[in-house]
Amino acid sequence: MENEKYYIAVNVGGRYPLLKTPQDYTEYFNEALSFRDLYAVLRYIEKHGLERIVIAVIKR
């Protein structure tokens, strides 16, 4: 599906509540990080050194 997007959630040491869905993520942060494909997600995670703190990659 072309309308599918991938979202990431990160563990920021308990500062934010666990976000269970992309909708919660969007509402809490006002603008979620979203990507068109899994490759873009993985490239972003690696580029910014987020390997240890990413807790979820969600496809919707």
Task: Give residue spans per PLM region.
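Short, mixed-charge low-complexity intrinsically disordered segments
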Residues: 38-60
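Short aromatic-glycine-(Arg/Gly/Cys) micro-motifs in beta-strand/loop hairpins
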Residues: 2-30
